[in-house]
C-alpha cells in the first residue's frame, strides 16, 4: 500500500497481503440521504457564487442569468442548473468560457453527489445567446424580461481599476 499526504508532500509505502479480488481497496462514499428539500436554494447560491467569479471582459459576456427549476423553486436532487449567457466575445473567448463552465459543472456535480448521493456527470446546462438572438426574441432570449417564467439576472464580478 502507498499512503500519500499531499499537505506535507510525503508518502509511505509498505507491503500487505494481496487482495483476493485483484482490485484496490478504494473506499467509496456510502449512499447518503438528501439533506433536505432545499435543492433549489443550494443551486441558486452556487449560481450566484459562479457568477460572482465571472469576469465579463475576459470572456466577452454582457450578462448571465439563471432559469428553470432553480428560479421556480422546483429543483430536485438530480436537477441541472440552467444558465443563460449573453455572449458577445470572440471564438477564443467562447472556447475559454465553455472550458471554465465545464470545470464548474464537474465540481458542482461532485458537490451535489456528496450532498445527495445522486450522480449527474455535470450540473450546468449553459445556453449562449447573442445580441441578434435578443433582438429577434429567439431561442432562450425570450426568457430575458419575460412576464412568465423569466430568467433571473446574476451579478458578475466587477471590474477593478
PLM regions: where:
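Acidic Asp/Glu-based divalent-cation binding sites
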Residues: 80-82
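Catalytic core of pol beta-like nucleotidyltransferases
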Residues: 2-65, 71-78, 87-161
